[in-house]
Swiss-Prot record:
Gene Ontology CC annotations of this record: mitochondrial outer membrane
Gene name linked to the record: bna4-2
Reactions this protein catalyses: L-kynurenine + NADPH + O2 + H(+) = 3-hydroxy-L-kynurenine + NADP(+) + H2O
UniProt protein name: Kynurenine 3-monooxygenase 2
Gene Ontology BP annotations: 'de novo' NAD biosynthetic process from L-tryptophan; anthranilate metabolic process; kynurenine metabolic process; L-tryptophan catabolic process; quinolinate biosynthetic process
GO molecular function per UniProt: FAD binding; kynurenine 3-monooxygenase activity
Compartments where found: Mitochondrion outer membrane
Regions annotated as coiled coil: none
Length: 488
Protein backbone atom coordinates (compact mmCIF):
# COMPACT_ATOMS: atom_id res chain seq x y z
CA UNK A 1 0.00 0.00 0.00
CA UNK A 2 0.95 3.61 -0.49
CA UNK A 3 0.02 6.51 1.71
CA UNK A 4 0.43 9.26 -0.89
CA UNK A 5 -2.62 10.74 -2.58
CA UNK A 6 -6.11 9.38 -2.55
CA UNK A 7 -8.29 7.22 -4.80
CA UNK A 8 -11.74 8.78 -5.12
CA UNK A 9 -14.56 6.73 -6.62
CA UNK A 10 -17.73 8.47 -7.74
CA UNK A 11 -20.68 6.09 -7.57
CA UNK A 12 -21.31 3.40 -4.98
CA UNK A 13 -23.31 0.94 -7.08
CA UNK A 14 -22.03 -2.60 -7.71
CA UNK A 15 -19.29 -1.49 -10.12
CA UNK A 16 -18.07 1.40 -7.97
CA UNK A 17 -18.18 -0.73 -4.82
CA UNK A 18 -16.19 -3.51 -6.47
CA UNK A 19 -13.64 -0.94 -7.68
CA UNK A 20 -13.26 0.25 -4.08
CA UNK A 21 -12.61 -3.30 -2.89
CA UNK A 22 -9.93 -3.76 -5.57
CA UNK A 23 -8.38 -0.38 -4.75
CA UNK A 24 -8.25 -1.23 -1.05
CA UNK A 25 -5.68 -3.96 -1.81
CA UNK A 26 -3.23 -1.37 -3.15
CA UNK A 27 -4.00 1.89 -1.41
CA UNK A 28 -4.73 2.85 2.18
CA UNK A 29 -6.84 5.90 1.35
CA UNK A 30 -9.93 5.10 -0.73
CA UNK A 31 -13.12 7.16 -0.66
CA UNK A 32 -16.46 6.39 -2.30
CA UNK A 33 -19.08 9.08 -2.87
CA UNK A 34 -22.67 8.07 -3.58
CA UNK A 35 -25.83 10.10 -4.05
CA UNK A 36 -28.24 7.65 -2.42
CA UNK A 37 -28.19 4.92 0.20
CA UNK A 38 -29.97 1.79 -1.04
CA UNK A 39 -29.99 0.36 2.46
CA UNK A 40 -32.89 2.75 2.88
CA UNK A 41 -35.82 3.66 0.65
CA UNK A 42 -35.65 7.43 0.34
CA UNK A 43 -39.00 9.06 -0.07
CA UNK A 44 -39.57 11.00 -3.21
CA UNK A 45 -36.71 9.39 -5.11
CA UNK A 46 -36.77 9.61 -8.88
CA UNK A 47 -38.24 6.59 -10.66
CA UNK A 48 -34.89 6.18 -12.40
CA UNK A 49 -33.27 5.75 -8.97
CA UNK A 50 -35.92 3.26 -7.83
CA UNK A 51 -35.39 0.84 -10.70
CA UNK A 52 -35.06 -2.77 -9.64
CA UNK A 53 -34.58 -4.87 -12.77
CA UNK A 54 -32.81 -8.00 -11.60
CA UNK A 55 -29.15 -8.31 -12.40
CA UNK A 56 -27.96 -11.29 -14.43
CA UNK A 57 -24.61 -12.58 -13.21
CA UNK A 58 -22.47 -14.61 -15.60
CA UNK A 59 -18.88 -15.84 -15.91
CA UNK A 60 -17.34 -12.39 -16.36
CA UNK A 61 -18.93 -10.97 -13.23
CA UNK A 62 -18.17 -14.07 -11.18
CA UNK A 63 -14.51 -13.99 -12.22
CA UNK A 64 -14.24 -10.31 -11.28
CA UNK A 65 -15.70 -11.06 -7.85
CA UNK A 66 -13.32 -14.00 -7.40
CA UNK A 67 -10.33 -11.83 -8.36
CA UNK A 68 -11.27 -9.37 -5.61
CA UNK A 69 -10.08 -11.99 -3.12
CA UNK A 70 -13.28 -11.64 -1.06
CA UNK A 71 -14.39 -15.28 -0.97
CA UNK A 72 -16.94 -14.65 1.80
CA UNK A 73 -18.50 -11.89 -0.29
CA UNK A 74 -18.82 -14.15 -3.32
CA UNK A 75 -20.39 -16.88 -1.19
CA UNK A 76 -22.87 -14.40 0.30
CA UNK A 77 -23.86 -13.15 -3.16
CA UNK A 78 -24.23 -16.64 -4.62
CA UNK A 79 -26.40 -17.74 -1.68
CA UNK A 80 -29.08 -15.28 -2.79
CA UNK A 81 -28.60 -15.95 -6.51
CA UNK A 82 -31.00 -18.20 -8.39
CA UNK A 83 -29.49 -20.24 -11.24
CA UNK A 84 -31.21 -19.98 -14.62
CA UNK A 85 -30.39 -22.89 -16.93
CA UNK A 86 -32.02 -21.40 -20.01
CA UNK A 87 -34.99 -19.57 -21.46
CA UNK A 88 -38.53 -20.84 -21.12
CA UNK A 89 -40.38 -19.40 -24.09
CA UNK A 90 -44.14 -19.07 -23.63
CA UNK A 91 -46.84 -18.76 -26.25
CA UNK A 92 -49.74 -20.49 -27.94
CA UNK A 93 -49.45 -23.62 -30.05
CA UNK A 94 -49.27 -23.10 -33.80
CA UNK A 95 -50.82 -25.60 -36.24
CA UNK A 96 -49.80 -24.76 -39.78
CA UNK A 97 -50.75 -21.12 -40.22
CA UNK A 98 -53.33 -21.05 -37.44
CA UNK A 99 -52.75 -20.38 -33.76
CA UNK A 100 -54.70 -22.47 -31.26
CA UNK A 101 -55.76 -21.33 -27.82
CA UNK A 102 -53.64 -23.98 -26.11
CA UNK A 103 -50.64 -22.65 -24.20
CA UNK A 104 -47.18 -24.10 -24.70
CA UNK A 105 -43.71 -23.73 -23.19
CA UNK A 106 -40.45 -24.37 -25.05
CA UNK A 107 -37.13 -24.74 -23.23
CA UNK A 108 -33.99 -23.25 -24.81
CA UNK A 109 -30.88 -24.33 -22.89
CA UNK A 110 -28.23 -21.65 -22.53
CA UNK A 111 -25.24 -23.94 -22.90
CA UNK A 112 -24.68 -27.55 -23.99
CA UNK A 113 -22.30 -28.08 -21.06
CA UNK A 114 -24.90 -27.06 -18.48
CA UNK A 115 -23.56 -23.61 -17.57
CA UNK A 116 -26.11 -21.30 -16.00
CA UNK A 117 -26.73 -17.62 -15.51
CA UNK A 118 -27.75 -16.29 -12.09
CA UNK A 119 -30.63 -13.99 -11.24
CA UNK A 120 -29.63 -11.44 -8.59
CA UNK A 121 -31.74 -8.97 -6.66
CA UNK A 122 -30.32 -5.50 -7.30
CA UNK A 123 -30.76 -4.17 -3.78
CA UNK A 124 -29.42 -7.34 -2.13
CA UNK A 125 -26.27 -7.18 -4.25
CA UNK A 126 -25.67 -3.53 -3.39
CA UNK A 127 -26.15 -4.20 0.31
CA UNK A 128 -23.75 -7.18 0.28
CA UNK A 129 -21.05 -5.10 -1.42
CA UNK A 130 -21.52 -2.15 0.90
CA UNK A 131 -21.39 -4.33 3.99
CA UNK A 132 -18.05 -5.63 2.72
CA UNK A 133 -16.87 -2.05 2.27
CA UNK A 134 -18.02 -1.17 5.79
CA UNK A 135 -15.75 -3.93 7.06
CA UNK A 136 -12.77 -2.59 5.07
CA UNK A 137 -10.94 -0.04 7.26
CA UNK A 138 -9.11 1.81 4.47
CA UNK A 139 -12.32 2.55 2.54
CA UNK A 140 -14.64 5.38 3.55
CA UNK A 141 -18.15 5.76 2.12
CA UNK A 142 -20.01 9.06 1.91
CA UNK A 143 -23.71 8.96 1.07
CA UNK A 144 -25.93 11.80 -0.18
CA UNK A 145 -23.04 13.39 -2.09
CA UNK A 146 -23.53 14.53 -5.69
CA UNK A 147 -20.52 15.37 -7.87
CA UNK A 148 -20.93 18.85 -9.36
CA UNK A 149 -17.47 19.81 -10.61
CA UNK A 150 -13.93 18.54 -11.13
CA UNK A 151 -10.62 20.27 -11.76
CA UNK A 152 -8.48 17.65 -13.45
CA UNK A 153 -5.39 19.87 -13.45
CA UNK A 154 -5.27 20.47 -9.70
CA UNK A 155 -6.99 17.12 -9.07
CA UNK A 156 -9.87 18.31 -6.96
CA UNK A 157 -13.57 17.48 -7.06
CA UNK A 158 -16.53 19.22 -5.44
CA UNK A 159 -19.62 17.50 -4.10
CA UNK A 160 -23.01 18.88 -3.24
CA UNK A 161 -24.03 17.51 0.15
CA UNK A 162 -27.66 16.61 0.61
CA UNK A 163 -29.46 15.86 3.83
CA UNK A 164 -30.51 12.28 4.47
CA UNK A 165 -34.21 12.17 3.47
CA UNK A 166 -34.85 9.39 5.97
CA UNK A 167 -33.95 11.69 8.89
CA UNK A 168 -35.34 14.96 7.59
CA UNK A 169 -38.90 15.94 6.72
CA UNK A 170 -37.66 18.58 4.29
CA UNK A 171 -34.32 17.49 2.80
CA UNK A 172 -32.07 20.35 1.76
CA UNK A 173 -28.75 20.92 0.06
CA UNK A 174 -25.68 22.40 1.73
CA UNK A 175 -24.78 25.86 0.48
CA UNK A 176 -21.02 25.19 0.41
CA UNK A 177 -19.80 22.33 -1.81
CA UNK A 178 -17.40 19.87 -0.25
CA UNK A 179 -13.92 20.02 -1.78
CA UNK A 180 -12.07 16.70 -2.07
CA UNK A 181 -8.49 16.33 -3.42
CA UNK A 182 -7.61 13.14 -5.27
CA UNK A 183 -4.67 11.40 -6.84
CA UNK A 184 -6.76 9.10 -9.04
CA UNK A 185 -10.46 9.52 -9.90
CA UNK A 186 -12.67 6.59 -10.93
CA UNK A 187 -16.10 7.46 -12.31
CA UNK A 188 -18.69 4.73 -11.82
CA UNK A 189 -21.65 7.09 -11.68
CA UNK A 190 -23.92 5.56 -14.29
CA UNK A 191 -25.28 6.43 -17.71
CA UNK A 192 -25.79 10.11 -16.84
CA UNK A 193 -22.25 10.34 -15.48
CA UNK A 194 -21.05 13.70 -14.20
CA UNK A 195 -17.49 12.33 -14.17
CA UNK A 196 -17.72 11.73 -17.91
CA UNK A 197 -19.07 15.24 -18.45
CA UNK A 198 -16.18 16.72 -16.47
CA UNK A 199 -13.60 14.69 -18.41
CA UNK A 200 -15.08 16.07 -21.64
CA UNK A 201 -14.11 19.57 -20.50
CA UNK A 202 -10.43 18.59 -20.63
CA UNK A 203 -10.04 16.27 -23.61
CA UNK A 204 -11.76 15.47 -26.91
CA UNK A 205 -14.10 12.59 -26.14
CA UNK A 206 -16.30 11.03 -28.81
CA UNK A 207 -19.73 10.48 -27.36
CA UNK A 208 -22.84 8.79 -28.73
CA UNK A 209 -26.13 8.52 -26.86
CA UNK A 210 -29.05 6.57 -28.26
CA UNK A 211 -32.49 5.89 -26.88
CA UNK A 212 -34.26 2.72 -28.02
CA UNK A 213 -37.71 2.99 -29.56
CA UNK A 214 -38.77 0.87 -26.60
CA UNK A 215 -39.65 1.70 -23.00
CA UNK A 216 -39.93 -0.66 -20.07
CA UNK A 217 -42.36 -1.10 -17.23
CA UNK A 218 -41.70 -3.16 -14.12
CA UNK A 219 -44.30 -5.64 -12.87
CA UNK A 220 -44.31 -8.47 -10.34
CA UNK A 221 -45.66 -12.01 -10.24
CA UNK A 222 -46.31 -12.73 -6.55
CA UNK A 223 -45.77 -16.13 -4.92
CA UNK A 224 -48.76 -18.43 -4.48
CA UNK A 225 -51.03 -17.45 -1.61
CA UNK A 226 -51.43 -20.88 -0.01
CA UNK A 227 -47.87 -22.20 -0.09
CA UNK A 228 -45.87 -19.00 -0.74
CA UNK A 229 -44.04 -20.71 -3.61
CA UNK A 230 -43.10 -19.86 -7.19
CA UNK A 231 -45.94 -19.73 -9.70
CA UNK A 232 -43.53 -20.77 -12.46
CA UNK A 233 -40.50 -23.07 -12.50
CA UNK A 234 -37.82 -20.86 -10.92
CA UNK A 235 -34.65 -21.95 -12.72
CA UNK A 236 -35.39 -20.24 -16.01
CA UNK A 237 -35.66 -16.84 -17.57
CA UNK A 238 -39.29 -16.83 -18.71
CA UNK A 239 -39.96 -14.99 -21.97
CA UNK A 240 -43.15 -14.16 -23.83
CA UNK A 241 -41.94 -12.93 -27.25
CA UNK A 242 -44.55 -10.81 -28.98
CA UNK A 243 -43.04 -9.27 -32.09
CA UNK A 244 -42.53 -5.62 -31.16
CA UNK A 245 -43.43 -6.45 -27.55
CA UNK A 246 -41.75 -8.68 -24.98
CA UNK A 247 -42.47 -9.77 -21.41
CA UNK A 248 -39.74 -11.31 -19.22
CA UNK A 249 -39.85 -12.81 -15.73
CA UNK A 250 -36.79 -13.25 -13.47
CA UNK A 251 -36.95 -15.44 -10.33
CA UNK A 252 -36.40 -13.71 -6.97
CA UNK A 253 -35.37 -15.13 -3.57
CA UNK A 254 -38.80 -14.32 -2.05
CA UNK A 255 -40.45 -16.77 -4.52
CA UNK A 256 -41.79 -13.95 -6.66
CA UNK A 257 -40.80 -12.99 -10.21
CA UNK A 258 -39.51 -9.57 -11.13
CA UNK A 259 -41.07 -8.89 -14.55
CA UNK A 260 -40.31 -6.41 -17.29
CA UNK A 261 -42.67 -5.38 -20.06
CA UNK A 262 -40.91 -3.95 -23.13
CA UNK A 263 -42.96 -2.13 -25.76
CA UNK A 264 -42.91 0.94 -28.02
CA UNK A 265 -43.58 4.10 -26.03
CA UNK A 266 -46.57 5.01 -28.20
CA UNK A 267 -48.23 1.67 -27.47
CA UNK A 268 -47.76 1.88 -23.71
CA UNK A 269 -48.96 5.49 -23.70
CA UNK A 270 -52.10 4.39 -25.53
CA UNK A 271 -52.64 1.56 -23.06
CA UNK A 272 -52.14 3.85 -20.09
CA UNK A 273 -54.92 6.14 -21.34
CA UNK A 274 -57.23 3.19 -22.09
CA UNK A 275 -59.60 1.35 -19.73
CA UNK A 276 -58.29 -1.77 -17.93
CA UNK A 277 -60.22 -4.08 -20.26
CA UNK A 278 -57.98 -2.98 -23.14
CA UNK A 279 -54.90 -3.79 -21.04
CA UNK A 280 -56.24 -7.28 -20.24
CA UNK A 281 -56.96 -7.96 -23.92
CA UNK A 282 -53.46 -6.77 -24.82
CA UNK A 283 -51.86 -9.21 -22.37
CA UNK A 284 -54.10 -12.08 -23.47
CA UNK A 285 -53.15 -11.47 -27.10
CA UNK A 286 -49.40 -10.97 -26.74
CA UNK A 287 -48.50 -12.66 -23.43
CA UNK A 288 -50.96 -15.55 -23.03
CA UNK A 289 -51.10 -17.14 -19.61
CA UNK A 290 -49.84 -14.12 -17.67
CA UNK A 291 -53.16 -12.56 -16.67
CA UNK A 292 -55.10 -13.70 -14.73
CA UNK A 293 -53.18 -16.98 -14.25
CA UNK A 294 -49.99 -15.41 -12.84
CA UNK A 295 -51.02 -11.82 -12.12
CA UNK A 296 -54.62 -11.05 -11.19
CA UNK A 297 -56.47 -8.45 -13.22
CA UNK A 298 -56.70 -6.08 -10.27
CA UNK A 299 -52.97 -6.41 -9.52
CA UNK A 300 -51.97 -6.01 -13.17
CA UNK A 301 -54.13 -2.92 -13.51
CA UNK A 302 -52.72 -1.36 -10.35
CA UNK A 303 -49.10 -2.15 -11.20
CA UNK A 304 -49.29 -1.06 -14.83
CA UNK A 305 -51.00 2.27 -14.24
CA UNK A 306 -48.84 3.17 -11.22
CA UNK A 307 -45.41 2.00 -12.43
CA UNK A 308 -43.30 4.48 -14.40
CA UNK A 309 -42.60 3.73 -18.04
CA UNK A 310 -38.89 4.33 -18.44
CA UNK A 311 -36.62 4.71 -21.48
CA UNK A 312 -33.73 2.48 -22.49
CA UNK A 313 -30.48 4.29 -23.18
CA UNK A 314 -27.33 3.13 -24.91
CA UNK A 315 -24.04 5.03 -24.65
CA UNK A 316 -20.72 4.72 -26.46
CA UNK A 317 -17.72 6.93 -25.84
CA UNK A 318 -14.00 7.02 -26.53
CA UNK A 319 -11.59 7.23 -24.80
CA UNK A 320 -12.51 6.06 -21.31
CA UNK A 321 -9.76 7.95 -19.51
CA UNK A 322 -8.01 11.29 -19.09
CA UNK A 323 -4.22 11.12 -18.86
CA UNK A 324 -3.20 9.68 -15.52
CA UNK A 325 -5.95 11.48 -13.60
CA UNK A 326 -9.26 9.78 -14.27
CA UNK A 327 -11.10 6.85 -15.82
CA UNK A 328 -14.77 5.96 -16.28
CA UNK A 329 -16.11 2.42 -15.93
CA UNK A 330 -19.44 0.60 -16.11
CA UNK A 331 -22.47 2.45 -17.44
CA UNK A 332 -20.57 5.73 -17.25
CA UNK A 333 -18.45 4.45 -20.14
CA UNK A 334 -20.79 2.07 -21.94
CA UNK A 335 -24.44 1.97 -20.94
CA UNK A 336 -26.11 -0.79 -22.93
CA UNK A 337 -29.56 -2.21 -23.48
CA UNK A 338 -30.35 -5.04 -21.03
CA UNK A 339 -31.01 -7.73 -23.62
CA UNK A 340 -27.81 -9.71 -23.16
CA UNK A 341 -27.65 -9.46 -19.38
CA UNK A 342 -24.11 -8.11 -19.67
CA UNK A 343 -24.38 -4.61 -18.20
CA UNK A 344 -23.33 -5.66 -14.69
CA UNK A 345 -20.86 -8.25 -15.98
CA UNK A 346 -19.14 -5.85 -18.37
CA UNK A 347 -18.87 -3.26 -15.59
CA UNK A 348 -17.34 -5.74 -13.15
CA UNK A 349 -15.01 -6.95 -15.89
CA UNK A 350 -13.95 -3.31 -16.35
CA UNK A 351 -12.78 -3.30 -12.74
CA UNK A 352 -10.80 -6.53 -13.08
CA UNK A 353 -9.09 -5.47 -16.30
CA UNK A 354 -8.40 -1.94 -15.03
CA UNK A 355 -6.60 -3.13 -11.92
CA UNK A 356 -4.84 -5.94 -13.81
CA UNK A 357 -3.35 -3.30 -16.12
CA UNK A 358 -2.49 -0.95 -13.25
CA UNK A 359 -0.75 -3.90 -11.61
CA UNK A 360 1.07 -4.91 -14.80
CA UNK A 361 2.37 -1.35 -15.19
CA UNK A 362 3.46 -1.37 -11.52
CA UNK A 363 1.48 1.79 -10.81
CA UNK A 364 1.22 1.09 -7.11
CA UNK A 365 4.84 0.02 -6.84
CA UNK A 366 6.35 3.35 -7.92
CA UNK A 367 7.72 5.52 -5.16
CA UNK A 368 8.07 8.76 -7.11
CA UNK A 369 4.84 10.46 -8.13
CA UNK A 370 6.18 11.34 -11.61
CA UNK A 371 7.02 7.70 -12.35
CA UNK A 372 3.64 6.69 -10.97
CA UNK A 373 1.83 9.19 -13.20
CA UNK A 374 3.67 7.96 -16.30
CA UNK A 375 2.94 4.35 -15.42
CA UNK A 376 -0.74 5.05 -14.73
CA UNK A 377 -1.11 7.08 -17.94
CA UNK A 378 0.31 4.14 -19.90
CA UNK A 379 -1.99 1.69 -18.10
CA UNK A 380 -5.07 3.84 -18.71
CA UNK A 381 -4.19 4.31 -22.37
CA UNK A 382 -3.94 0.55 -22.78
CA UNK A 383 -7.20 0.16 -20.86
CA UNK A 384 -9.06 2.53 -23.21
CA UNK A 385 -7.56 0.93 -26.30
CA UNK A 386 -8.84 -2.44 -25.13
CA UNK A 387 -12.18 -1.66 -23.52
CA UNK A 388 -13.53 0.83 -26.06
CA UNK A 389 -13.60 -1.84 -28.76
CA UNK A 390 -15.08 -4.41 -26.41
CA UNK A 391 -17.68 -2.00 -25.00
CA UNK A 392 -18.83 -1.05 -28.49
CA UNK A 393 -19.05 -4.72 -29.42
CA UNK A 394 -21.27 -5.77 -26.51
CA UNK A 395 -23.38 -2.63 -26.91
CA UNK A 396 -24.18 -3.63 -30.50
CA UNK A 397 -24.73 -7.28 -29.55
CA UNK A 398 -27.17 -6.26 -26.81
CA UNK A 399 -29.24 -4.22 -29.22
CA UNK A 400 -29.24 -7.03 -31.78
CA UNK A 401 -30.23 -9.61 -29.16
CA UNK A 402 -33.47 -7.72 -28.51
CA UNK A 403 -34.64 -8.52 -32.03
CA UNK A 404 -33.80 -12.17 -31.39
CA UNK A 405 -35.53 -12.33 -28.01
CA UNK A 406 -38.78 -10.68 -29.04
CA UNK A 407 -39.35 -12.97 -32.02
CA UNK A 408 -36.24 -14.58 -33.43
CA UNK A 409 -36.08 -17.36 -30.81
CA UNK A 410 -38.99 -18.99 -32.65
CA UNK A 411 -37.61 -18.56 -36.17
CA UNK A 412 -36.52 -21.68 -38.14
CA UNK A 413 -33.20 -20.05 -39.12
CA UNK A 414 -32.32 -19.29 -35.48
CA UNK A 415 -33.24 -22.83 -34.38
CA UNK A 416 -31.30 -24.45 -37.23
CA UNK A 417 -28.07 -22.52 -36.58
CA UNK A 418 -28.37 -23.09 -32.82
CA UNK A 419 -28.83 -26.84 -33.39
CA UNK A 420 -25.80 -27.13 -35.70
CA UNK A 421 -23.51 -25.00 -33.52
CA UNK A 422 -24.46 -26.80 -30.31
CA UNK A 423 -23.90 -30.17 -31.99
CA UNK A 424 -20.42 -29.09 -33.13
CA UNK A 425 -19.65 -27.69 -29.66
CA UNK A 426 -20.80 -30.88 -27.95
CA UNK A 427 -19.48 -33.59 -30.28
CA UNK A 428 -16.44 -31.98 -31.93
CA UNK A 429 -14.93 -29.85 -29.11
CA UNK A 430 -11.50 -29.81 -30.78
CA UNK A 431 -12.90 -27.42 -33.39
CA UNK A 432 -13.34 -24.81 -30.66
CA UNK A 433 -16.84 -24.12 -31.96
CA UNK A 434 -19.20 -22.27 -29.61
CA UNK A 435 -22.46 -20.42 -29.95
CA UNK A 436 -22.37 -16.65 -29.73
CA UNK A 437 -24.37 -16.74 -26.50
CA UNK A 438 -21.97 -19.22 -24.93
CA UNK A 439 -18.93 -17.12 -25.82
CA UNK A 440 -20.50 -13.96 -24.40
CA UNK A 441 -21.97 -15.41 -21.21
CA UNK A 442 -19.75 -18.35 -20.30
CA UNK A 443 -16.26 -17.19 -21.15
CA UNK A 444 -14.06 -14.16 -20.58
CA UNK A 445 -13.04 -13.81 -24.22
CA UNK A 446 -12.91 -10.19 -25.30
CA UNK A 447 -16.28 -9.11 -26.67
CA UNK A 448 -14.65 -7.82 -29.86
CA UNK A 449 -12.97 -11.20 -30.41
CA UNK A 450 -16.28 -12.96 -29.78
CA UNK A 451 -17.87 -10.95 -32.60
CA UNK A 452 -15.04 -11.79 -35.01
CA UNK A 453 -15.18 -15.52 -34.21
CA UNK A 454 -18.96 -15.60 -34.51
CA UNK A 455 -18.83 -13.93 -37.91
CA UNK A 456 -16.20 -16.44 -39.04
CA UNK A 457 -18.41 -19.31 -37.87
CA UNK A 458 -21.31 -17.79 -39.78
CA UNK A 459 -19.28 -17.74 -42.99
CA UNK A 460 -18.18 -21.34 -42.44
CA UNK A 461 -21.78 -22.46 -41.93
CA UNK A 462 -22.84 -20.56 -45.03
CA UNK A 463 -20.05 -22.20 -47.02
CA UNK A 464 -20.98 -25.63 -45.64
CA UNK A 465 -24.64 -25.15 -46.57
CA UNK A 466 -23.63 -23.92 -50.03
CA UNK A 467 -21.40 -26.95 -50.54
CA UNK A 468 -24.23 -29.16 -49.34
CA UNK A 469 -26.61 -27.70 -51.90
CA UNK A 470 -23.97 -28.03 -54.64
CA UNK A 471 -23.33 -31.65 -53.65
CA UNK A 472 -27.05 -32.42 -53.83
CA UNK A 473 -27.26 -30.82 -57.28
CA UNK A 474 -24.26 -32.80 -58.53
CA UNK A 475 -25.51 -36.09 -57.09
CA UNK A 476 -29.03 -35.72 -58.42
CA UNK A 477 -27.65 -34.43 -61.72
CA UNK A 478 -25.44 -37.49 -62.04
CA UNK A 479 -28.27 -39.83 -61.11
CA UNK A 480 -30.56 -38.10 -63.58
CA UNK A 481 -27.97 -38.40 -66.33
CA UNK A 482 -27.44 -42.08 -65.56
CA UNK A 483 -31.20 -42.68 -65.62
CA UNK A 484 -31.57 -40.98 -69.00
CA UNK A 485 -28.64 -43.00 -70.31
CA UNK A 486 -30.30 -46.23 -69.23
CA UNK A 487 -33.57 -45.22 -70.94
CA UNK A 488 -31.73 -44.75 -74.19
Amino acid sequence: MTADGKIVIVGGGPVGSLAALYASHYHDNVEVYELRDERQNPAGASPLLQKSINFTLSERGIRALEKSGRTDLLRAIMRTAIPMHGRMVHGRMVHGRSVSGKLQETFHQYDVHGNSLYSLDRKALNIALRQELDATPNVKMFFHHKLIRADMNTRKVWFEQREDPSTSTSPSTSSTPKEVPFDFLIGADGAHSTTRQQIMRYTPLDYQQQYADTVWCELRIPPTEKTNSFRLPPNYLHIWPGGEYMFCAFPCPDQSFNCILFAPASRLDALKSSPPATLFDFFDTHFPGVCPDLISQSSLSQQFYQSPHLPLIGIKCSPHHLGSAAVIIGDAAHAMFPFYGQGLNAGMEDVRILFDLLDEHRVFGHGKSLDKDHARAAALTEYSNQRVRDAHAIHDLSRRNYLELRGGVNSPVYKARKFVEEALQRYVPLLGWRTLYSRVSFSDQRYSEVVVKNELQGWVLLLMSGLGVLLHVLVFGALGGAFLGLKR
